UniProtKB/Swiss-Prot annotation:
HAMAP family with a match to the protein in the record: MatK
Taxonomic lineage from the root: Eukaryota, Viridiplantae, Streptophyta, Embryophyta, Tracheophyta
Species of the source: Picea mariana
Molecular function terms from GO: RNA binding
Pfam families given in the database record: Intron_maturas2, MatK_N
Protein name: Maturase K
GO terms for cellular component: chloroplast
Gene name, Swiss-Prot/TrEMBL: matK
Subcellular location: Plastid, Chloroplast
Similarity annotation: Belongs to the intron maturase 2 family. MatK subfamily.
C-alpha cells in the first residue's frame, strides 16, 4: 500500500489505470484467502476450517478464467468448492475472489481519502464515536432543535457502481463489482430492486461498501455547502477504518430542487452541528422554526436527487429541546435552565449577578429499560423480577457473571447522567432475578440460596458499581465528582439495550405516521 501511495503522488493517472490487471494476479487471492481464514477462525467450527486446508489455486485460476469470459461473469456467488462439508453459502473460493476484489478497490479509496484528509487543516483526527457525548454536552445547550435520523441504507446497485465511477477512471474494473451487486440482489429472498449496504455481517466487502457510501453522501453534501457559501470554515474528511464523523457547519446555503446550484436564501446567523454514529446521524440547529422546516424539506430532496433514495419525510423529525425530549442513544435528551451565581470583586466593591444558563440534561429512561428487561424475561411487564429459565442449565459462576455483566454495562452506560436514582430499581430487578434463577436451578427457595451461599452470593456480582460511583479520592474530590459528568470511552459499545430501544422508538414513529 505504501508503494501505491508513492506511485500515486508521482502520477495521479496511474492510480486509475492499473486496477483491472490486478484481478488476474494469483498473489492477490492468496492474500485474500489468508484474510478470509483470519476473519472466519473465530466464528466457524473446526471441521469447516480443516476443509479450507485443501484450498486449491487451480480452482481460483478457473474462476479467473470464467471472469474473463463475458457470458460467465457472474460466478462469485456460485458454489465452486468440491468439498461437501463446506456450506454452499460460505464457499471459501467465492469469498476469496470477493476479498480480492475488495482489496483492489480499497487501493484508490484509501489514497483518495488520505489526500483529502491531509488538505484539511481544521479536521481533528481524534474525532470518533467517543466524542459523541462530549459533543452533545457542548452543543446541545446552544441549540434549540435536534434531529436523530437513520441514514438510508437501501440503495440500487447501479447507484453504488456510479459512486465508484466518479473517482475510478478504470471502467473495466467496475464490471466485476456490478456483477457481484446484481447477483447478490437477485440471490436475496426479497424481490426488491435495491440492496442493503449496512454492514450487518462483518465482511470486508460490505464494510467497504458502507464506508464508501457514507463517504460519498457526506462529501457531496459538504462540497455543495462549500460551493454555495464560499465559507472557509467548512471542513470535511474521511477515514476508511473510522465510520464516525464529526463536523460543525457555521454558514450554509440551501438549494431548491429545480435549481440546485443557485442559492435562493442564505443563512448566516444560525448554527448547524452534525455528528454521525454508526447508522444514525444527529443534527442540532440553532435557528427559527422556518429554518427547521426548510432544512427538513431539503435533506430528503438532496438524497433523492443525488442517490435516488426515497426518504420518507416523517423520518426527518426535529424536536424542540425547550419543550420536548428527544430520544437518542438510549437517553431522553433535553436542555434545562440552570441558575448560576456569579460574584465579581472590583477594588472594594463586590458585585453579585444571577445568571440563567442552559445545561444539557440526559435522562435515564427507567420505564423503557424495564420494558426491555421484561422482553428478555428478567421481569414481568410491571417490573416484578422473575427467574431466567433459559440460564438454569449454566453453572453458578456463569449465571453470576452474566447478571454482573448486564448491570455493569447499564450502570456504566448511564454514568454521565446526574439523576441515577432510578438505576437502583434496575439493580433490584437484576439481583432478585439472579437469586430466583439460582433458586430455580437448585430447586429451592431464595432464602435457602442466600443461606447456603451467604455473603458470597453477590460478592462478585454488582461489584463494579462501587469502583465507578465512589472514586478513591478525598472528600472534596468525591463531592466534585457528584456534580460532574464522567463519560467513559467504551460506553457506546457495551449497551445493546440502547440499540433495541432506539428500534422500538423508530417503529412507534412509523406507526404514528401510518395512522
Amino acid at each position: 500500500m505504501d508503494e501505491f501511495h508513492r506511485y500515486g503522488k508521482e502520477d495521479s493517472s496511474w492510480q486509475q489505470c492499473f486496477l483491472y490487471p490486478l484481478f488476474f494476479q494469483e498473489d492477490l487471492y492468496a492474500i485474500s484467502h489468508d484474510h478470509y481464514l483470519d476473519g472466519s477462525s473465530s466464528s466457524e467450527p473446526m471441521e469447516h476450517l480443516s476443509s479450507n486446508d485443501q484450498f486449491s489455486f487451480l480452482t481460483v485460476k478457473r474462476l479467473i478464467g470464467q471472469i474473463r469470459q463475458q457470458n460467465h461473469s457472474i460466478v462469485l456467488f456460485v458454489n465452486c468448492d468440491p468439498n461437501p462439508l463446506v456450506d454452499r453459502k460460505k464457499s471459501s473460493y467465492s469469498e476469496s475472489v470477493l476479498e480480492g476484489l475488495t482489496l483492489v478497490l480499497e487501493v484508490p479509496f484509501s489514497i483518495r481519502s488520505k489526500y483529502s484528509v491531509e488538505g484539511m487543516n481544521e479536521w481533528k483526527s481524534f474525532r470518533s464515536i467517543h466524542s459523541i457525548f462530549p459533543f452533545l454536552e457542548d452543543k446541545f445547550p446552544h441549540s434549540n432543535y435536534v434531529s436523530d435520523t437513520r441514514i438510508p441504507y437501501s440503495i440500487h446497485p447501479e447507484i453504488l457502481v456510479r459512486t465508484f465511477r466518479r473517482w475510478i477512471g478504470d471502467a473495466p474494473s467496475l464490471h466485476p463489482l456490478r456483477s457481484i451487486l446484481y447477483e447478490y440482489r437477485n440471490s436475496s429472498e426479497s424481490l426488491q430492486r435495491s440492496i442493503i449496504v449496512v454492514p450487518k455481517v462483518n465482511t470486508r466487502f460490505f464494510l467497504f461498501l458502507w464506508n464508501n457510501y457514507v463517504y460519498e453522501c457526506e462529501s457531496i453534501l459538504v462540497s455543495l455547502l462549500k460551493r454555495s457559501s464560499h465559507s472557509r470554515s467548512l471542513s470535511h474528511g474521511s477515514f476508511p477504518q473510522r465510520t464516525h464523523f464529526h463536523r460543525k457547519i457555521k454558514n450554509i446555503f440551501l438549494f431548491s430542487r429545480r435549481n440546485s446550484f443557485q442559492s435562493i436564501w442564505s443563512l448566516k446567523d444560525p448554527n448547524i452541528h452534525y455528528v454521525r454514529y454508526g447508522e444514525r446521524s444527529i443534527i442540532a440547529i440553532k435557528g427559527t422554526h422556518l429554518l427547521v422546516k426548510k432544512y427538513r424539506y431539503y435533506l430528503p430532496i438532496f438524497r433523492q436527487c443525488y442517490f435516488h433514495l426515497w426518504n420518507e419525510p416523517y423520518r426527518v423529525c426535529f424536536h424542540q429541546l425547550s419543550k420536548n425530549c428527544s430520544s437518542s442513544l438510549g437517553y431522553f435528551l433535553r436542555v434545562r435552565m440552570k441558575p448560576l451565581l456569579v460574584k465579581t470583586k472590583m477594588l472594594d466593591e463586590l458585585f453579585i449577578a444571577d445568571l440563567i444558563t442552559d445545561e444539557f440534561d440526559p435522562i435515564v429512561p427507567i420505564v423503557p429499560i424495564i420494558g426491555l428487561l421484561s422482553r428478555e424475561k428478567f421481569c414481568d411487564i410491571s417490573g416484578r423480577p422473575i427467574s431466567k429459565l433459559s440460564w438454569t442449565s449454566l453453572t453458578d459462576d456463569d449465571i453470576l457473571d452474566r447478571f454482573d455483566r448486564i448491570w455493569r454495562n447499564i450502570f456504566h452506560y448511564y454514568s454521565g447522567s446526574f439523576g441515577r436514582d432510578g438505576l437502583y430499581r434496575i439493580k433490584y430487578i437484576l439481583s432478585l432475578s439472579c437469586a430466583k434463577t439460582l433458586a430455580c436451578k437448585h430447586k429451592s427457595t431464595i432464602r435457602v440460596v442466600r443461606k447456603e451461599l451467604g455473603p458470597e452470593l453477590f460478592k462478585k456480582s454488582f461489584s463494579k458499581e462501587r469502583e465507578l460511583d465512589s472514586p478513591p479520592f478525598s472528600s472534596k474530590a468525591a463531592a466534585r465528582s457528584q456534580r460532574e459528568r464522567i463519560w467513559h470511552s467504551d460506553i457506546p459499545q457495551i449497551n445493546p439495550l440502547a440499540h433495541s430501544w432506539q428500534k422500538i422508538q423508530d417503529l412507534k414513529i412509523e406507526n404514528l405516521f401510518d395512522q
